[in-house]
């Protein structure tokens, strides 16, 4: 197509986008008030979705019930749904609308191994001993996005606003297993802004990089030796398990000489069959975390060297495979600042005495500071400043040096399109994370109220993006001229790597039939707590 043809098309597209901005401040305020009212009217739908996904309790890559349920709701609302993207059976993307801007909403859906917990009970009481459960709160984010998207869709239809809404789930986030494949395969190539959300204990948003979030690679090392009778002829065996243990010992000695920012941890994923057989196969699964791409790759190389050394000591061989990866995030200033204005408009939920009683009861049980639920919104976090550290250089922050921490593969998305993460207050302060305690509130009024508040913020920010082309322009200006000016995204995924969709399959097969007995039935029960016969709250 010639430039002479392209230019009028580009101008027409810009004009069509700009037309949506011709709204008075009074009209815009009225639209946002209408959105808040719509979302309040959808409280019941939000509660049902949150409770239903909590009851499914599915681990990463095995979120079949969850994905079917959530994508089905969007389909009934008129969204076009594509399922099973990029070789990941539980992935999907839902779209509605046409033209620019394209606003993409994402949140995670998987849960935590061995985190089964009765909601609203302020001590450890699993529904099924050893089963997975939502000990991170990922049952709430996509319901939040669905409520926001439906409300904005109705507003767009009524006001004849142009734009496209896209929704997708973060599959296997706890394995950092999917978003890098979404990026690599172009899910976000036409997207203008990504609004992600994640459960927290307050309303908040931040911009820039973070000193206490790492990227990572997830690598499994698989050793191969030779079996033998462990008592009758051990000299004829070559123990793959010995190789695993020697690699782990070597890595544990090396930790002393690694940077403060690094975090590394492992589990032995195959330790052999039984003691009287020299293990011919064994494997160990590592997470190597660091603050940037180069240092992550350095840890990966060090891990490979440890594995090679272990094989030399044991006359074994090894292969390895990438199971997941994540970049450290860098979040957009323009969108975060706009979102924070909407956070101030919405404010925190009004917590009941029972809400506070559950929070304080759980905090007392955990032996942490008893503060109850947050009653004041967080301030916008400064870029590159860690949470809960001494900004003057003492304490855990070590001045302006990376301190390390967890990882989330939304980081990969943030390096290809302007992205922010909304934190919403559905959890109780003081939980250790990845733990039964973080699931206590997640099918209670605390979670429901937090989702409704978050949906209002998400929806209002979407309207700002629809009405103000300059906001998208500012977002991309920051993305191009600050975030990616000197640092460009390079995927950890190699051509031979595939999504590790077999992970957690055996665990879910072990528990799924028993878990089905606890699936929420909203046709019979008003809430999941009613179905379970749990008094709200139940505390000591």
Protein language model features and the residues they cover:
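Hydrophobic h-region of N-terminal signal peptides that target proteins for export
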Residues: 10-18, 42
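Bacterial N-terminal signal peptides that target proteins for export
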Residues: 1-7
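Acidic/His- and Gly-rich active-site-bordering loop/insert found
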Residues: 20-134, 143-164
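Histidine/acidic-residue-rich, glycine-tolerant segments that coordinate divalent metal ions
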Residues: 124-133, 139-140, 157-279, 289, ...
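Metal-dependent amide/peptide-bond hydrolase catalytic core
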Residues: 245-540
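Divalent metal-coordination and catalytic microenvironments
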Residues: 53, 94, 105, 138, ...
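Structural recognition of the beta-strand scaffold that forms the well-ordered cores
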Residues: 82, 102-106, 166-169, 193-196, ...
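Acidic-glycine-rich active-site phosphate/pyrophosphate-binding loop
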Residues: 110-124, 212-222, 428-435
